[in-house]
Amino acid sequence: PELLENGMNFTSVIVKLNESVEASGIFLEDLQNDISHFLEHYHLKCLFAEKRVQYLVHHIYGRNALSPTTLSAVGSYISRQYDTCGKHLIAAGNTVTDIFRVYQSYASAVILLQNCFFFPEKTFLTENSIRLLSPKGPVPDFLQSPENTFSKYLLAGEEEPCFQFLDELFRYYSCNHT
């Protein structure tokens, strides 16, 4: 392995596979080779770690910090590589300088990964993409206690209001980062 120099920039990208998918070692090795080859065009490299089969962590690094455009291209490419695995979530952490701070990038990617559930599958979330979203505003009164409202409709056997309420709940929380 090559020596990592001081001042290297790192960005952690985490892919969470669907629970029912288990990627084989050979598949992952081929995938890592493809990603490494792609990253060479940007003068970047990758340290790969697999966590509990479902969480695939790519620590992307190089001398220069990734621009938002480069990060978007890298994230899109990595996401496409996992298309054969079916549904997956993907997020990138903040860029940090020096290897001893990589955990900070990883931790910020984990936090963003938690938000992926509110976005369409395969949406590549970054701090920048979240920042560009307009806030949804305060929770409407009728969504303040969703469990009470939903159980009221459910217990009354009111099918149409149940579906309308769930649609409203989905609309409010879909792509909502707040």
Predicted regions mapped to residue ranges:
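Hydrophobic, helix-rich cores of sensory/ligand-binding and other regulatory modules
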Residues: 1-178
